[in-house]
Structures are given as C-alpha cells and as structure tokens.
C-alpha cells in the first residue's frame, strides 16, 4: 500500500538551502515533488540533521560524574569510557543506545555515523538498537567489527598500527573508512591521510599545510567542537581552524561525539559553532543537514531524496 503525504511552508530547498514557498509531496519515504505555492502556512521546513560523528555506547556512562581530559576519559584502551563499556551487559547497552537514538530522532536527526567499539559484538548491539527506528545508521566498527559494519572507524593512525591495511581492505570491500585525526595534536593527521580515508574527524590542530592537503584530496572533516572543549583539547576559536578550512574549500560536516558528556543534539552543536567560532548560520546549517557524503547520503529537500 502506497503511503503518501504532503507538507507546505517555506522550505530550505536544494543543495544551497534556497528558501522557497512550496508543497512537498512524499511517497513511500521519497520526495516525489517540490511544487511552488503562493499561499503557504507560516512554518519553516528544514532538511533533517545528519550527526556525522557519534559514540552512542557512551550512553551507559551519562550519569557518572567525570573529570579529566582525553586520555583519562575516552582514549582506548583504558579511558574511563572503555572500562565502563567492558563491564556493561550487551542488553543494557542496546537499551541505552536505543533511548539515545529516540532522543536524536525527536530533535530532528535522521541519520548518524557511529564509531562503534567492542568488535563484532559492539556492532551487533548498535544494529539491534537502531532496528525498526526511523533513522539511517552508518556503523563503523573496529577490532573486527568493521567486517560486519558499513566500514571502519579508526581511533587514530598513531594508535592503530595496521590502520593503512584496514583502510585498504575496506576500500576493496566497497566500505567506508573514517579516522580520528588531529584531536590532541597535529601529528597523526598525515598518517591518516596516507591511508586515503573517506573522512576525518576533528582535525582540531591541523596545520595550514595539512588543511591544504585535506582540501586538495577532497576529504570531508567532521567537527565536534563542544567535545573538543569538554576534553580540554582546545580553549579558543582558533582550534579547530574552521575559517581556514572554509577558505581552503574543505567540506565541513558536524558531529556531537561522546554521549557520556555531550547530548547528541545537533541544534545545540551548530548553535555553539555559530556563536563560539563565528561561522555564518547558513554555512553551519548546511554542514549539519547536507547528509553524509562519504556514504552517498543527501538530506537536501529535492525530488528523489
């Protein structure tokens, strides 16, 4: 049975978020028409968010008081988060992640890319958590989990000695590869770039030369600015060097990172970036709603999406 509905208002349409008065017709989850209208309700229609970097398993650690920086809280294998994950039963993990996914949906997020710890069992837990929910998960595993996931999410080329081999294997399998890079310093960015990733996360301390290389190689960068401040890897608007990235032509995406201390609310994330870094509202809104190019996902309001 065909399911069709329509919604009218002022919509931010296409790849450039052009504001148009339209009626949008959706058939079986696909936009089949975007029709110009003269009289529409006074409401705005915005493309859904895509959260381009999450660690949803951290949900189980949300209520635990924690202080410290990157190494103490989230660095593998002995950061607080990893100790908690190892002690958490799988069923508890699934239920916690499912609750967080529901919150993401309620705040306008239609997809996410998760770096999933815990090998194949960890990937399986997130697959179960997202099952039947109206959201598109891109799951990137590690420690063998990449073999049953959408690809690999590598913590750092500095820490994972066979990261280049993993990246090559993923490419041959037609899967996605993402790297944490440049979160605490610039030293692992070139190592990650040498592996020809589909995207990088953070690049908080990217140098001018590295920014130029990232732009030349057409590699998107996912910013997680609230997390950078929380983990004390930055203390000002120069890091990550967003304006330099924009000037160089780097494609910028937005993620919220670790759920244990950052709510996966994309509106809060882009509001922070707009305010703290002075990024124009339209630019950062586009970064948060364009979808996930590494997986070929577009969230633009246009026919066929």
Annotate each language-model stretch with its function.
Residues 1-22, 26-30, 35-36, 98-105, ...:
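Active-site microenvironment of metallo-dependent hydrolases
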Residues 59-94, 190-191, 217-223, 273-279:
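Active-site gating loops and adjacent loop-to-helix segments of metal-dependent hydrolytic enzymes
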Residues 72-122, 161:
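Divalent metal-binding segments
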Residues 111, 137, 177, 220-221, ...:
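Hydrophobic beta-strand scaffold residues
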Residues 115-192, 198:
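Metal-coordinating catalytic core of metallo-dependent amide/deamination hydrolases
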Residues 186-305:
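Active-site-adjacent C-terminal substructures of enzyme catalytic domains
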